[in-house]
Amino acid sequence: MHKKKYFSSQSLKDLNTFAIDVTAKKIIFVKTIQSLIDISKICQLSNIPYIILGEGSNVLFLENYVGVVIINRIKGIKIVEKKNFWLLHVFSGEKWHNLVKLTLNLGILGLENLALIPGCIGSAAIQNIGAYGLEFKDVCQYVDILSLKDNTIKRIYKNSCKFSYRNSIFKDQYKNEHAVIRVGIKLSKKWRPILFSSLENYITPINITAYKIFNIICKIRKKKLPDPKKIGNAGSFFKNPLIKKKKAQKLINLYKVPNYPQKNGLVKISAAWLIENYKFKHLQIGDAAIHKKQKLILINKKNATAQEIIKLAKIIHKCILKKFNILLEPEVDLIGASGKIKASKIFKLNSKLKVI
C-alpha cells in the first residue's frame, strides 16, 4: 500500500506562489510513481478532473478547482560519471535550485546560470526554463514521461522534445494524461562560462569561476525579483515577444529597445522594457500590481484575487499592443475550475500577430 496524504477542501494558497486563495476538492501529495498512477486512475474511473503541480510557481488559479490537485514530491538523484561528462538522472519532484546547488558543491559545473529559478525539475523541462544565456534544452539529454492511460514510461530524447522559447512538446502533444517523471541532464567536464550581456556590469572574465557566476546571479535575482514567500507572484507573467527583424529594427530605431537576435532569424524584445516605457502611472487593481523593480512581474500585494490579476494583465496587454503593435503572450499557465485554460480565450490572442 502506497502512503498518500489526503486533504478535503483545502486552500491552495500555500501551494501556488501567486498566493491566490482558492480551494480544491482534494489535495494529494505523492512520493512515488505508483502513487501517481493509483490516484490518476481513480480520478479517471470516477470522471474527476485532476492536475499535477510541483511548486505551483508558474500557475494562476482563476477559480476554485473542482477536482484533485496532485502535488508531485517524487524525488531522487542519480549521478553517473563518464570520461568527458556527467550524466544526472533526476526525478521531477526535486526542486530545481536545490539541484543547481548540489551539483555546484560536487564540482559538477554548468547549471550556475539557472540559479534561484523557482519550481521543480518537471516544470523546468515543460517550460524550458532559461536565464542569463542558458536554457534547459542546452543541458537536457532526455525527458521520461509517464502515460497515465496505460502506465507506460516513454523516454523522449532532446531532439524530439521540440524545445523553443518557454515551450516544449510537453505543453502540447503530451500535456494531457501524461506526466514528466524524470529528466536526464548532461554536463561537460570542460566547463566554459556563459557571460550573458546583462552580467557584464557585475563580473569580469578574469579568474571567473562557476561559484562567482552562481553567487552574482543569486544576488541579482534577490535584488531585482520579489521573493514569493513574502510577495505573491509567478515570476514573469508575460513572455518576451519574438518578432521579425524588420519590425524589430523599427522599434530599435524609435525607442532603442533592448533586443536579442535569435538563431532562427527572429529578434527577442524585452517585455519588461515595453511595460516600463509605457509609463503606467500607479496602475493597481485591488491588491494586484506591477512590481516596481521588475515590470514583467505582476504581484499579489496581499489579498489579490485572480480576477484582479487578470484585469491588470489585460490592461497591460491592450496598452502594449496599442503603442508598440506587439502582442504580449502570458507565460503563466491559467487554471480554471476543471483544468488549464488557453490564454487565447482570455486575452484574445491572434495567432497571426505572434510574429510581426
From Swiss-Prot:
The residues covered by the FAD-binding PCMH-type domain are 20-190
Needs which cofactor? FAD
The biological pathway it contributes to is:
Cell wall biogenesis; peptidoglycan biosynthesis
KW 4Fe-4S (keyword) present? no
Provide the top EC class: oxidoreductase
Q: What is its main location?
A: cytoplasm
Q: Which reaction does it catalyse?
A: UDP-N-acetyl-alpha-D-muramate + NADP(+) = UDP-N-acetyl-3-O-(1-carboxyvinyl)-alpha-D-glucosamine + NADPH + H(+)
The reply to whether Chloroplast figures as a keyword in the UniProt entry is no
Keywords on this record? Cell cycle, Cell division, Cell shape, Cell wall biogenesis/degradation, Cytoplasm, FAD, Flavoprotein, NADP, Oxidoreductase, Peptidoglycan synthesis
Q: What is the active site of this protein?
A: R166, S236 (proton donor), E331
| Disulfide pairings | none
Q: Which GO terms describe its cellular component?
A: cytosol
Family annotation (Pfam families) = FAD_binding_4 (PF01565), MurB_C (PF02873)
One GO MF term attached to the UniProt entry = UDP-N-acetylmuramate dehydrogenase activity
Q: Extract the PROSITE patterns matched here.
A: FAD_PCMH
Output one GO BP term: cell wall organization
Task: Say which domain of life the source belongs to.
Answer: Bacteria
Summary of the function given for this chain in its UniProt record:
Cell wall formation.
In its UniProt entry, what is this protein called? Answer: UDP-N-acetylenolpyruvoylglucosamine reductase
Gene symbol of the encoding locus: murB
